[in-house]
Regions:
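C-terminal and inter-domain tail/linker signature
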Residues: 1-240
Length: 240
């Protein structure tokens, strides 16, 4: 960790874009900035012990190479022989805190009813999944995204949730049928303060290329930005 700090010392800053309001654990979305440019983005999850000391951290930067729809094709190829499982049963609920919404969607509803999941998204949802270059805007695009990634042999397995009220961060593994290794990731969910529906999502998966050579090269080449080419501050969709 000290080596990572030393590499960027005096060469750039970390902008905190969003931070969840959990007490026992929280997460934050961040962007590296240097001068008038911004670069690498990512998310960090931090969990405290009973003494208020940090006991667990997961931090994942965005992949430099974003495969887009090739991600789906690869996952479907890996799970081609998977046998469909019965849809899980769930008891319908309407949670209104961010961490409970996330838990309900991924511990209860997942794999059962896309329509029930969509009930919790705001009409103007801004959804950033770092497998893709561009964000998803609106419920129609998000619904198509969820349906695209719903096929036999893939399981989105949440691990740790924070206790945020208006926003929540949680860790997860993507488990593929018959594969011993998983794909780790982080998600950040933010609710609209009035409707209590999800208005913002950031999903960050591990790089599909392991070890992530492109990421290391970019950070060595431009340690202040962490990417090969930065963009003007605030020029990205949604400002981040």
């Amino acid at each position: 960790m000290l080596a990572k700090v030393a590499q960027r010392k005096g060469r750039g800053d970390v902008r905190i874009d969003k931070i969840s309001d959990g007490n026992a654990a929280c997460g934050f979305a961040w962007t590296w900035v240097s001068g008038n440019e911004e670069g690498l983005r990512g998310t960090t999850f931090i969990e405290l012990n009973e003494n208020g000391e940090i006991q667990y951290v997961r931090e994942i930067p965005e992949p430099i190479f974003k495969p887009g729809d090739l991600t789906v094709e690869l996952l479907k190829a890996v799970t081609a022989d998977a046998v469909p499982k019965p849809k899980p049963e769930y008891q319908k609920q309407t949670p209104t805190t961010a961490n409970e919404v996330a838990k309900y969607l991924f511990l209860n509803v997942q794999g059962s009813d896309v329509a029930e999941s969509m009930r919790f998204f705001d009409d103007r949802i801004f959804y950033r999944d770092f497998n893709y270059e561009e964000p998803l805007i609106g419920k129609a695009e998000v619904k198509n995204f969820i349906e695209t990634f719903s096929f036999p042999g893939i399981e989105f397995r949440p691990e740790r949730f924070d206790d945020g009220i208006d926003s929540s961060c949680f860790t997860w593994d993507v488990c593929l049928d018959g594969q011993p290794e998983t794909i780790k990731g982080l998600s950040f969910y933010e609710l609209d303060p009035e409707t209590r529906k999800i208005k913002y999502v950031r999903d960050v998966p591990e790089s599909a290329i392991k070890p992530p050579i492109l990421g290391k090269l970019a950070r060595d080449f431009r340690p202040g930005l962490g990417v090969f080419k930065g963009v003007p501050i605030g020029s990205r969709p949604g400002g981040m």
